[in-house]
Amino acid sequence: ALVKASRLETGIITTAPEPQPVGPLLEGALAQARPQAEAKGLTLAAEPCGAAARFDRKWTAEALFNVVDNAVKYTPAGGRVTLSAVPLGQFCRVDVSDTGIGIPEEEQGRIFGRFYRGGAVRAEEGVGIGLYLVREILRRQGGYVKVASRPGQGTTFSLYLPRE
């Protein structure tokens, strides 16, 4: 992840956004996360999606998987991770919602920073670069990411992909 971040920052890696359906992106992220989710006894689901957006398939898939992987990692056994996508003005909003541990409000503004790791997640493996990569990948395509969370109730990450 560190190498990818460095390559994105220096322009070695570029994105090539193209108009395409979002549904296969969601299904791909779920398929990739399914083994870990099943091992934890989590329910993974994607709501039916007919939305389309303009994005680089490879890099956006990586960004989405980073978010889904975190949702699986920080959701206790028996929990749920749901993906959905809806057109919203100039953007398509892709939501990853979980019933996980949540993120304290005071940390929400910092979680997209390079190397940031919240207090509640330090026991988990990682270096704090995944959400930074998500933000950078989306930004380079004209998109952005937001988070809404309450500790003990779960989190929703919303990835905004340009529709044109």
Describe each region flagged by the PLM:
Residues 78-90:
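Short beta-strand/loop element within the Bergerat-fold HATPase_c
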Residues 143-144:
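Conserved glycine-rich
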Residues 71-72:
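Short helix-loop "hinge" at the ATP-lid/N-box region of the Bergerat-fold HATPase_c
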Residues 103-115, 135:
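Short conserved segment of the HATPase_c
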Residues 98:
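Acidic ATP/Mg2+-coordinating residue in the GHKL
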